[in-house]
Every structure is written in C-alpha cells, then in structure tokens.
UniProtKB/Swiss-Prot annotation:
GO biological process, one term: riboflavin biosynthetic process
Top-level taxon of origin: Bacteria
Binding-site list for Mg(2+) 2: 38, 153
Protein name: 3,4-dihydroxy-2-butanone 4-phosphate synthase
Cofactor binding mode and count: Binds 2 divalent metal cations per subunit. Magnesium or manganese.
Residues binding Mg(2+) 1: 38
Organism listed in the record: Buchnera aphidicola subsp. Acyrthosiphon pisum (strain APS) (Acyrthosiphon pisum symbiotic bacterium)
NCBIfam families found in the cross-reference section: ribB
Cofactor(s) for this UniProt protein: Mg(2+); Mn(2+)
Amino acid sequence: MNQTLLSKFGKPIERIKNAILALKSGQGVIILDDEERENEGDLVFACENMTVEQMALSIRYGSGIVCLCITESKRKQLNLPMMVKKNTSAYRTGFTVTIEASKGISTGVSAKDRLTTIKTAIADDAKPSDLNRPGHVFPLRAHKGGVLSRPGHTEAAIEIVSLAGFKPAGVICELTNKDGTMARTPEIIKFSENKKMQVLTIQDLIFYIKNINHL
C-alpha cells in the first residue's frame, strides 16, 4: 500500500479514529485492501444511518453491486442460503442468495428501494418472510474471525462500523473509474478528497485490533 499517498489521512491509528468519528457523524468511509489482494477501495457505510443519498452515491460511483455485510447469526436469522455450496471464488467471498424487501418497494432497483431492503434485513426482529429472494441487494456473510482470519472488505466493514458503535452490519460497494475500470489508490484518494471522505486500510484495522482494541 502506498503509505505516501495515505499519509495525508494520518498514521494507521489516526485513520481508524477518524473513520470511527466519520461513521458516528453519519458519513461514509473508504477502505482499501492490500495491493497484492484485490487492490480495490470500497465505499463503506453503517447500515443503521445510511441515507438514500449515500446509496445513490454508491450506485453512481461504485460498481453497482451493492453488498450488505452481515454476521453468520444474522444470516441464520434471515434463513439465507449461501449462493453456492462449494465456493471456488478467489477470495471465498461469502455471497448468500440475493434479497429484496417483501414490502415497501417497487422494482427493488432504486437507491430508495435498495436501502429499504437493507433496513428491513438488519432490523432486530427481521424474519425470513420480510425478504423476497432473489433481489437487487447482495448479502455477504463475514468470516467469524473477522479481519484477523480473513482480511477482506466484508469483515473490515463489520469491524469498523462495530467500532463506531453500530450493529455489525455494513454496506459496501467497490469504487470504479468513469471508464468502468476499477479505481486504484491514486484515483481513490482523489475521489475521497472531492467527497471529503476518510480513507483507511484493512491493514490499519488489523493493527488497531491487535494493538489497541485488545488491550
């Protein structure tokens, strides 16, 4: 990871603390993974206070694949089967079947509809019948060991929103360039400056959890 580009956001601990403050104030953050992994940046929002405008931003500037990061216990609560029995994807991303709110939406595609689906899914009393399958939101089941076991965006999103005091449920969407290619660190930094968003890395989170959060 290019630490020179990231230095304007502070050192690793500062980046985590700034991200926590941003999420608490209702903003989103951007999480980068390792250059040797996916080498991508994801927009990340806490499900509980995400707005329609933020969902629209994710759809417009992201890949369009809006994912809901959830725990295994939430997956079981909603009775969501994994998308495939044998996961052969490169990083074993934990896709479940896609979902749609069974009430309160139209086609399920709009920013408002996708956010309604997410708010429905994360409700404490959510039931399997509250969701239709398939749909336009992609739930991702996080590894139970978090980023220490799987250093992916799914786990990182749940870690950072939990550190900010929210339910362990986050929305992620990969940032892309105007030409449809994946945004890399220089483009991601430029985007973050334009949108005034905090940037952190999965390695920052791992360092924080090992050295600060577990003291």
